[in-house]
């Protein structure tokens, strides 16, 4: 199932499944539920969020996740540590479009030069950099190593 970015902006996963004829609606809904239920936060990432928050950092979510996945993540206690969020399915714009970064900066009064954007897609990092935001690529194949790198970069040495 391939959707243009424009279409993705306007829908959630459940909406996109409405056009799938190859699988009965109930099966698609079950697949969606199981896909979401199998997800869990990456443990090193959870701890990094806690460490950064304890060090006084302001933390924000900038995400292209669907409404269903964002609603799922909001149930985890660690999500409550974030100071705000800009989520594409609620905004009608997606990364790497410059407007979504501008909304994050404007909504929360962030200085691009003092903002670090962590993402798993080089195109999203490049789009942020074009607006003066520093970036760090997150490597899902080595989450602990990426979190350690960020800890060394951002937290004072003990």
What are these regions (language model features)?
Residues 7-8, 52, 61, 85, ...:
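Generic structural signal for small/hydrophobic residues in well-ordered secondary structure
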Residues 14-17, 31-35, 69, 73:
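Hydrophobic alpha-helical core bundles mediating ligand binding, dimerization, or RNAP-core interactions
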Residues 66-67, 73-158:
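Asp-based, Mg2+/Mn2+-dependent phosphohydrolase catalytic module
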Residues 25-60, 98:
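Short, acidic loop-to-helix structural element flanking the phosphoryl-transfer center
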């Amino acid at each position: 199932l391939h959707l243009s970015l424009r279409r993705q902006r306007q829908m959630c996963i459940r909406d996109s499944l409405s056009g799938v004829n190859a699988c009965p609606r109930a099966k698609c809904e079950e697949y969606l539920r199981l896909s979401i239920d199998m997800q869990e936060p990456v443990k090193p990432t959870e701890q990094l969020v806690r460490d950064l928050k304890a060090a006084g950092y302001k933390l924000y979510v900038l995400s292209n996740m669907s409404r269903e996945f964002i609603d799922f993540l909001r149930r985890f206690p660690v999500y409550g540590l974030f100071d705000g969020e800009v989520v594409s399915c609620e905004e009608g714009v997606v990364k790497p479009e410059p407007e979504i970064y501008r909304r994050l900066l404007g909504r929360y009064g962030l200085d691009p030069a003092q903002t670090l954007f962590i993402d798993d897609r080089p195109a999203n990092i490049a789009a942020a950099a074009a607006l003066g935001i520093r970036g760090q690529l997150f490597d899902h194949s080595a989450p602990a190593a990426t979190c350690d790198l960020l800890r060394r970069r951002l937290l004072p040495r003990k």
